[in-house]
Amino acid sequence: MSNGQLIYLMVAIAVILVLAYVVAIFLRKRNEGRLEALEERKEELYNLPVNDEVEAVKNMHLIGQSQVAFREWNQKWVDLSLNSFADIENNLFEAEGYNHSFRFLKASHQIDQIESQITLIEEDIAAIRNALADLEKQESKNSGRVLHALDLFEELQHRVAENSEQYGQALDEIEKQLENIQSEFSQFVTLNSSGDPVEAAVILDNTENHILALSHIVDRVPALVTTLSTELPDQLQDLEAGYRKLIDANYHFVETDIEARFHLLYEAFKKNQENIRQLELDNAEYENGQAQEEINALYDIFTREIAAQKVVENLLATLPTYLQHMKENNTLLGEDIARLNKTYLLPETAASHVRRIQTELESFEAAIVEVTSNQEEPTQAYSVLEENLEDLQTQLKDIEDEQISVSERLTQIEKDDINARQKANVYVNRLHTIKRYMEKRNLPGIPQTFLKLFFTASNNTEDLMVELEQKMINIESVTRVLEIATNDMEALETETYNIVQYATLTEQLLQYSNRYRSFDERIQEAFNEALDIFEKEFDYHASFDKISQALEVAEPGVTNRFVTSYEKTRETIRF
């Protein structure tokens, strides 16, 4: 190694040693600062006047629960002052030794433990001092609370004394609980003044709760007593009186246990008084509600019968008139059937329907007479009579609907006859008009399809007229033949228009094709075929298709042009 390198090495070692020394001095100073702070915190804790506070509470000569609590906190303070502070002192001394001997890591770890110890001691001392303060203040705190509780109690006593009649059977139990609360106050005073404010506070808590609970009871009882002793019995008496009047007025009831239900309600009132006496207020309130529901149910029964009586009177006044009206209607229906039977073949169901209705009306009349005759001494509840009479009214309404249906069918017979005669005359005229319309077209011949439709329509029209000329007209047969003839006439009219349209358009297209025939052999050939079909087969539709297809090749759209023009000027059949 050269001299230069040796010098550099020595300088480097010197720098490292200086840095190490500086770091060591820094760590040592920092630990010393932390130790001094911990020493100050320890001294502050040690100098707290806890001993004075302990002596002050000890001189109060506590007893009972208060004394037990004091002993626990006092023992905790003794343990702290004798053991915990000594441990901290030893740990501080040990940490200083580590710091002076440059064992900084151990010193730092020891300092951390001391900080934790002091923090725990701070918390324990705070808890001890708070507990001692509570013990010292408990007596005066109790004195303040008891004044408020006494005010509430005296107010409660005053309310009960001034309104004793409102509490009914509950008064004895309320007064008994007032006496119990009074005893609790005496017990509180004894404990609080003899050195056990903690136990006294527990007694005071219970007393306050009992006052609040009894106040709530006192609030609820009057309404329950009024309902049970006055309102419900009054309602029940009114119901009984109303029931007697209804019985005297010959009312009957579906329910056969009404008297027993009255008795059960009175028994329920007596039993519920026991709930009031024992201050079972929830049970008493529930039983009051049940009794009210039963009274309401009985009231509904009576009002139902009263309302039903009015409905029955109204039905008995209107049903005979209604029935008489329906009997008259049935007589008119019978007369209509007899009159129509002279001209028309009516189905047997019409006459049998009217006879059945007559039988039902007679049975309903007997039922109405029976109910009416029993009204002076009714034997059924009006609600039952109401149901029966309303059912009877519904059945009469159904029969009336049947009468209306029969009447409409009978009336329709003559209307159908008149309509068929009018249509027959119209169809005869249409046949003549269509025949003349076709003759004016000067067609080379009439297609067989037209002739078949024409003769079919003519024959069916004749059949319709024959049916109408019968001595006894079968209107169902007339209606059936009329429908056939109507369909035939519609088909004939459509076929007539089609034949004339295709014949006219074919003639126009044949004439128009002359401009192409001289130089277009295909059109010439189509012309010859179409003309042959037109003049010999009389199939004007096929002839039209033949010439139009050829012209469309030479001149697209020409067919539509002719069709559109024709539709604008087409001659209609004037019936």
From Swiss-Prot:
InterPro entries: EzrA (IPR010379). Its main location: membrane. It comes from the Bacteria. Residues 105-191, 265-301, 354-416, 456-526 form a coiled coil. Pfam families: EzrA. It is a single-pass membrane protein. It is found in: Cell membrane. One of its GO terms (cellular component) is septin ring. The chain crosses the membrane at residues 9-27. Residues 28-575 are cytoplasmic. Residues 1-8 are extracellular. GO terms for biological process: division septum assembly; septin ring assembly. Keywords: Cell cycle, Cell division, Cell membrane, Coiled coil, Membrane, Septation, Transmembrane, Transmembrane helix. Negative regulator of FtsZ ring formation; modulates the frequency and position of FtsZ ring formation. Inhibits FtsZ ring formation at polar sites. Interacts either with FtsZ or with one of its binding partners to promote depolymerization. Belongs to the EzrA family. This is Septation ring formation regulator EzrA.
